[in-house]
Amino acid sequence: MVYIIAAYHDLGRLIDNETHNIESAKMLRNDKFLLKNFSSDEVKIMAEAVEDHRASLGREPRSIYGKIVSSADRNPTVESMLERAYDYNKLLHPNLSEDEIIEDARIHIREKYAPDGYAAKTMYFKDAGFEAMLKEVERITRTPEIFSRIQKNFNKKRFGK
């Protein structure tokens, strides 16, 4: 069941990024193969886990399945975090300057992964790698100057500029 939940958890992004967890759960609930091969209770548990996987949900997942997928859905590396936050801000705000995009990315990463961030608080299993990544995020996002330098160096490696 965890594999199915993992496969479905972000499919709803094809429909709507903001409500992707709800859209993904709808897709899972309507999958004829799953309805044929799993009990209605199992389909319900899987759909709820898909709905509950978001770190920004504001509440604990309803099942162990939701906790597993939610915890596994965290960005595993600082590099992936830099890439996603920068690219998303650039896409969302194409008229902002490079420095404004970088600062928005820094703020987002801090809101999500700083010690009091919503994703930092919703890791349901002990994970030394995740904890080390959180410490690194705290270090690099503490000041705009440090973060900007790191992001610009990362972008040079990515884009060759």
Regions found by a protein language model. Name each.
Residues 20-24, 42, 64-70:
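Short acidic-hydrophobic sequence patches enriched in Asp/Glu that either
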Residues 8, 57-161:
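Divalent metal-dependent phosphate-bond-processing catalytic cores, especially two-metal-ion Mg2+/Mn2+ enzymes
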Residues 33-40, 89:
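Inter-helical turn/loop segments and adjacent helix faces that build the functional surface
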Residues 19-35:
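An active-site-proximal "capping" alpha-helix that borders the catalytic cofactor pocket
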